[in-house]
Amino acid sequence: FDINIERIDELNLGHDRTLEVEDGLLNSVLDTDNGKSVGLHVCANKEAIKKCNIFIVTVPTPTDRHNRPVLTPMIKSSEIIGSVLKKGDIVIYESTVYPGVTEDEMVPILEKVSGMRFNQDFYCGYSPERINPGDKEHTVTKILKVTSGSTPEIAEVVDQLYKSIIIAGTHKAPSIKVAEAAKVIENSQRDINIAFINELSKIFNLMGIDTAEVLEAAGTKWNFLSFKPGLVGGHCIGVDPCLLYTSPSPRDKRQ
């Protein structure tokens, strides 16, 4: 489901403009008339998702010009899902967020719109998106997936769901907040380390030292994490550190 009708029409014609999925593979699983028992059905009609019992939200979480997280795509998605939510349904979020967004920000929206109670009538899970765009070797099924659920039973359901898809396996986190935090730091770590190497590269250049040779020498130690100078960008890595320093502190929540 997507609100972008142009995107839906394109996928139904068997083409993915991002080139993450080849046309042949897409066409082999596509269900354009919703007649298959198993297949990919893409639509922009909210009515078509009413019969679903598991909803997976994969929308972006950008930042504004003040580097504050913009949760609007997640909020709108939660409102749409809340309007069709049924007893026993599970809502799984994959968007990168600061710890607490799923349970403290999205759950109240689901409850308000659906009129149902969290962990009694419906449940939630969180499994951070792990993809490497443009990488044909480390595809989505070959990257280990972190999973979590709002109760131990739901955590197991979510974990088994992803295990049926992810060849590389899964890691079941003890809570949704742990899974949320894990995603933020894995991206932030890359941003920080690459930025650090970039600064060192500037210093070494002024000193007439070859950075590549320095990294090669340092890399002879078993626990040295090797990062090369380069660009840090994309829609996630450069943004995710902002999620950490803008997340509400425990003191803020008490007040």
State where each predicted segment sits.
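Conserved N-terminal Rossmann-fold NAD(P) cofactor-binding segment
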Residues: 3-54, 61-67, 112-114
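Internal alpha-helical scaffold of NAD(P)-dependent oxidoreductase catalytic cores
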Residues: 108-224
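Redox-cofactor binding/interface segments in oxidoreductases and associated redox assembly factors
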Residues: 56-57, 93
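A structural motif shared across PLP-dependent enzymes of the aminotransferase-like
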Residues: 237-241
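Rossmann-like NAD(P)(H) cofactor-binding subdomain of soluble oxidoreductases
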Residues: 63-130
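Conserved, function-defining core regions and hallmark residues within catalytic/recognition domains
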Residues: 55, 244
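Conserved small/polar residues in nucleotide/adenosyl-binding loops
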Residues: 245-252
